[in-house]
C-alpha cells in the first residue's frame, strides 16, 4: 500500500512540475529576446532533468504538441469534446496535463487536452 501511495505522490509531482515548466515557458515568451535566451536554457535543463529523474524512477512523461490531430484512442481526457460534432476533424489546442506511463508503456495517468477544429 505504501508503494502505491509513493507512486501516486511521484506521479502528482511529475504532473505539477510539468505544469510549472509550461507556465515558465509562457512567461519566457513575454520577455525581450536577450532575457528570453538567458532563461530558456534553464527551462531546457529543467525539462531534461525532469525526464531523466522520471525515467530513473520507472516513469515516462508523454505529451502531444498543439496542432497534432486528435484521435479518440489517445490516452487523454478532453475538457471540451461536447463543443464539437462527432464527425468534425479535431486537433489538440493545448495539453493541460501530460500522460504518465511506466517503463513498460502502461498508462498510469491519462493526460488532459483542450481541442479545436482542424
Where are the regions a protein language model picked out?
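Extended, amphipathic alpha-helical stalk segments that mediate dimerization
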Residues: 1-37, 45-118
Amino acid at each position: 500500500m505504501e508503494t502505491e501511495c509513493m507512486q501516486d505522490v511521484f506521479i502528482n509531482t511529475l504532473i505539477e512540475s510539468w505544469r510549472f515548466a509550461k507556465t515558465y515557458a509562457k512567461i519566457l515568451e513575454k520577455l525581450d529576446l536577450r532575457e528570453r535566451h538567458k532563461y530558456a536554457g534553464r527551462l531546457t535543463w529543467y525539462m531534461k532533468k525532469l525526464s531523466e529523474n522520471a525515467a530513473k524512477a520507472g516513469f515516462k512523461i508523454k505529451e502531444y504538441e498543439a496542432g497534432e490531430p486528435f484521435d479518440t484512442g489517445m490516452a487523454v481526457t478532453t475538457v471540451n469534446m461536447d463543443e464539437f460534432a462527432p464527425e468534425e476533424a479535431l486537433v489538440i489546442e493545448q495539453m493541460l496535463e501530460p500522460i504518465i506511463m511506466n517503463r513498460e508503456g502502461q498508462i498510469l495517468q491519462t493526460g488532459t487536452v483542450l481541442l479545436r477544429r482542424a
